[in-house]
């Protein structure tokens, strides 16, 4: 294997006493959450809308994609059509986030699903760039204060990407179905 996709021993290393306590607390509160959800559905819908807008804005800013708060809200609420490349990427992100939110129980991490979500991510963009693996190598770089560039992250080479995604998904699903590690720890 070209990368280490070990979802059994690597996640087990995360099980510090503090993490185990947090996971237990999350599971304990999960039952109480159902009652709270039923009693406060309107407030939660409002919170969800705010969260979707903030999450979309934050995730896109990480990628260097910016727009005004007003435009972001309009795009996420589907009250506006994207005007430029940044807004097209925001609209695509909104679509994928909505798919995950509405159908997460039915989404299995498999290569074809990942490619479908990638296609949807770029569905508003020009040039059919979504839904396929990269066809050229890339390196994520950073520039220091003196202007020197260095590799921050070296992704899998293009010719190995499909194989790496197959392996990643297979190892993750294997660990998920083995049920040896709490799923909250297993999720990357």
What are these regions (language model features)?
Residues 1-188:
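FIC/Doc superfamily catalytic core
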